[in-house]
Amino acid sequence: MGQGQGTPWIQSTGHISTQKEEDGQKIPKLEHRNSTRLMGHYQKTMNQVAMPKQIVY
């Protein structure tokens, strides 16, 4: 199950990055700060879920 979850997570992170760049211009700074907090949360979760072998791209 851990390996299966890893793939979607990576794809989701990529999607979020793309949206952040596009929406970042229109969205206020307040929203931008929220996005940064979300990104930090995702990174923490990925560190816990993703295993050293998975990190290798």
UniProtKB/Swiss-Prot annotation:
Give the region (Disordered) as residue ranges. Answer: 1-36
Q: Quick one: a GO cellular component term?
A: host cell cytosol
Record-linked Pfam families: PB1-F2 (PF11986)
- Which residues are in coiled coils? none
Q: Which InterPro entries match?
A: Flu_proapoptotic_PB1-F2
Location of this chain's protein in the cell: Host nucleus; Host cytoplasm, Host cytosol
Q: Which UniProt keywords apply?
A: Host cytoplasm, Host nucleus
Bias (Basic and acidic residues) occurs at: 18-34
BP terms from Gene Ontology? symbiont-mediated suppression of host cytoplasmic pattern recognition receptor signaling pathway via inhibition of MAVS activity
Q: Which family does it belong to?
A: Belongs to the influenza viruses PB1-F2 family.
Described purpose of this protein according to its UniProt entry = May play an important role in promoting lung pathology in both primary viral infection and secondary bacterial infection.
Q: What else is known?
A: Is not encoded in all strains, and seems to be dispensable for replication.
Please give the name of this protein: Protein PB1-F2
